[in-house]
């Protein structure tokens, strides 16, 4: 039992005991006949049980609710070259989801919701949002949507310090685009970023935790590089 739970439990006990003492003092239990004494004790017991049920069903889940947060940095392990069986070495970028609450969160999904392009490369440039962009599920790392679509889209995240990684996108060797890592995508809309500065919005939803939304600025030089320092310089991603 956490300190917060202990405080709530103590508060409930004090409420019941305080109410009992108040009525005992006000009505002098010695002057009440036996039948009324029994009824009074039953009433106090009922109130106490009701408060405990409210605590168990409402207050305790609220105290112990999951709390998810997004972590990212433009360095390993969030951004790195993949080790594959082939000679190709795609460069992947992920963010991490951590549950800092007290209970697990079910059906956690990450959704790419909005995309903007920068009108120019200046610091104070305006952003032009992609029109009619349809939100898409990003893929949880190390999952293959062709083998198990549900596992690729939805994740159970347990409380603690463990980081659950979700893919943002990748750059393939000898390619000049930053491709979003989507579980499924629409053929009617673009699923990659070309050279330049862009901004994206990602939200993480779940069955029993509050939605978390973050924006990322992606500054992409348009050329895959073979070393980590070169890629960190050529593909700069900042979480706002």
Located regions from the model:
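Membrane-embedded hydrophobic alpha-helical segments
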Residues: 5-65
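Low-complexity, acidic Ser/Thr/Pro/Gly-rich terminal tails and inter-domain linkers that flank the onset
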Residues: 58-86
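Short, solvent-exposed loop/turn segments enriched in Ser/Thr/Gly
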Residues: 85-94, 197-199
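Residue-level recognition of well-ordered beta-strand positions that form the cores
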Residues: 94-98, 111-113, 201-205
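Short, acidic/polar linear motifs in exposed loop/turn regions
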Residues: 99-104, 116, 208
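Short, hydrophobic/aromatic beta-strand segments
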Residues: 103-112, 121-125
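Extended, solvent-exposed segments with strong compositional bias
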Residues: 127-194
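Acidic, serine/threonine- and proline-rich intrinsically disordered appendage/tail regions
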Residues: 147, 155, 188-240
């Amino acid at each position: 039992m956490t300190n917060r739970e202990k405080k709530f439990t103590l508060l409930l006990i004090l409420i019941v005991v305080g109410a009992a003492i108040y009525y005992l003092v006000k009505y002098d239990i010695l002057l009440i006949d036996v039948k009324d004494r029994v009824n009074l004790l039953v009433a106090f017991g009922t109130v106490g049980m009701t408060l405990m049920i409210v605590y168990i069903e409402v207050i305790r889940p609220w105290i112990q609710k999951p709390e998810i947060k997004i972590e990212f940095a433009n360095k390993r392990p969030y951004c790195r070259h993949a080790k594959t069986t082939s000679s190709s070495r795609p460069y992947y970028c992920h963010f991490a989801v951590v549950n800092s609450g007290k209970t697990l969160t079910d059906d956690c999904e990450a959704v790419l919701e909005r995309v903007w392009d920068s009108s120019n490369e200046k610091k104070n440039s305006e952003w032009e949002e992609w029109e009619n962009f349809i939100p898409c599920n990003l893929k949880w790392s190390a999952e293959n949507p062709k083998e198990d679509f549900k596992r690729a889209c939805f994740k159970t995240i347990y409380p603690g310090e463990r980081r659950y990684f979700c893919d943002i996108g990748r750059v393939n060797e000898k390619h000049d685009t930053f491709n979003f890592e989507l579980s499924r995508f629409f053929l009617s809309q673009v699923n990659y970023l070309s050279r330049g500065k862009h901004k994206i919005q990602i939200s993480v939803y779940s069955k029993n935790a509050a939605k978390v939304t973050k924006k990322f600025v992606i500054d992409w030089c348009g050329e895959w590089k073979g070393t980590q320092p070169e890629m960190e310089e050529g593909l700069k991603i900042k979480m706002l």
